[in-house]
Amino acid sequence: MAASNALLLISGVLLISLAVLCHGDPVVDSDGDAVQLNLGGNYPLYTIQSAAIGFRGGLSTLHKDACKSYVYEAPETDRGLPVGFSASATSQPVMQLGSRYKFSFSMPVPLICDTAWSIGKSTEETGVYKLAACSCEFCKIACPEVGSFNVNGRTLLGIGGEHFTVRFQKFDALAMKTAPQ
């Protein structure tokens, strides 16, 4: 009986230790500020810029039908769609490395459609990140890395493919309206 209690105690300590070790550093945007989550109320939107084209183009979505969309790398002159981030598993106000978040592209879509994209985070260098697609927010399995694929001249994102890194930039609606096209 004492051995099983000791094992239970050691398991509990190990789980707490793993939780502390897995608690990541904050993800930062292009200004060096922590990326803010949507916890209700006012929260900033961001654009996600691809390192492959010098952080000039953003990510956007391409709709196949009413609710199915693909994420793609927009051309250099297109800043992409604004994105908000949320996580049901945290009350932390900022995104942290190694945690899972829903990326919600801000766009007009039918109300029956879910525009959230589940993603995991890992870092390569300060302010530049790799994305990982997760099948669910609370699964215990590792999330595969997101890469890029060239399909008919358009760069789509998916599992595997070419190495793909990004950075986050605060979305400025005024700059989007006045930017030369």
From Swiss-Prot:
* Pfam families the UniProt entry points to: Kunitz_legume
Q: Does the keyword Protein transport apply?
A: no
Q: Which GO terms describe its cellular component?
A: extracellular region
Cystine residue pairs: C67-C113, C134-C143, C136-C139
Could you tell me where this protein is found in the cell?
Answer: Secreted
Q: Where is this site: Reactive bond?
A: R100, Y101
Keywords carried by this UniProt record: Disulfide bond, Protease inhibitor, Secreted, Serine protease inhibitor, Signal
Has keyword RNA-binding? no
Predominant subcellular localization, coarse grouping? secreted
Which family is this protein grouped under? Answer: Belongs to the protease inhibitor I3 (leguminous Kunitz-type inhibitor) family.
Q: What's the name of the protein?
A: Proteinase inhibitor A
